[in-house]
Amino acid sequence: MAKRRAAEPVTFHVPWKRLLLCDFAEQPPPPPLWIRPPGVAHAGQLLGVPEQHRKRKIDAGTMAEPSASPSKRRDSGDNSAPSGQEREDHGLETGDPPLPPPPVLPGPGEELPGARLPGGGGDDGAGRAGPPRGDWGVASRQHNEEFWQYNTFQYWRNPLPPIDLADIEDLSEDTLTEATLQGRNEGAEVDMES
């Protein structure tokens, strides 16, 4: 059995990558569309600066002291505070002010408080199970009836009616006895015909 290349199992199911895996010895590779002249810098390089390696060299000094640059110090250059204390208005490591808490997003059956127009939105509450709610504090945290009626395919469905198990048991017993009687009668008719 022939050995496979490492890229083949990953890319062979993609049609346009199959061509990359095939070896075309008959045709030479097309020339690049644009060849950079030797004096022109690439997009991230300054003019007149010789091209350096892309990867940053890491030495032991920068790894030992991560906050060496003044722009990354927590105290913005003020070293009068002890190192154990942190200012409350700054973030943990970056020195940025803390972000405001994210807004509370409503569940799938609810709306944002400012999403409705002041005039009522124009639909007059059509398609709602209950009256429109005015307070969003406690009601948005509780699971409402519309949330539980929303299925996984994100289509609305009608709620199922309550089912009495006694009715199902009675129906299943009646149909079983009728089916067994019909099965016995059909078996007798088949025997008589042959």
From Swiss-Prot:
Biased composition, class Gly residues, residue ranges: 117-128
One Pfam family, short name: WRNPLPNID
InterPro entries in alphabetical order: C9orf40-like, WRNPLPNID
Positions where Phosphoserine occurs in the chain: 69, 76
Stretch list, region Disordered: 45-138
Compositional bias ranges of the Pro residues kind: 97-106
Residue ranges, compositional bias (Low complexity): 107-116
Keywords attached to this entry: Phosphoprotein
Signal peptide boundaries: none
Protein's name in the database: Uncharacterized protein C9orf40
Taxonomic source organism: Homo sapiens (Human)
Gene designation per UniProt: C9orf40
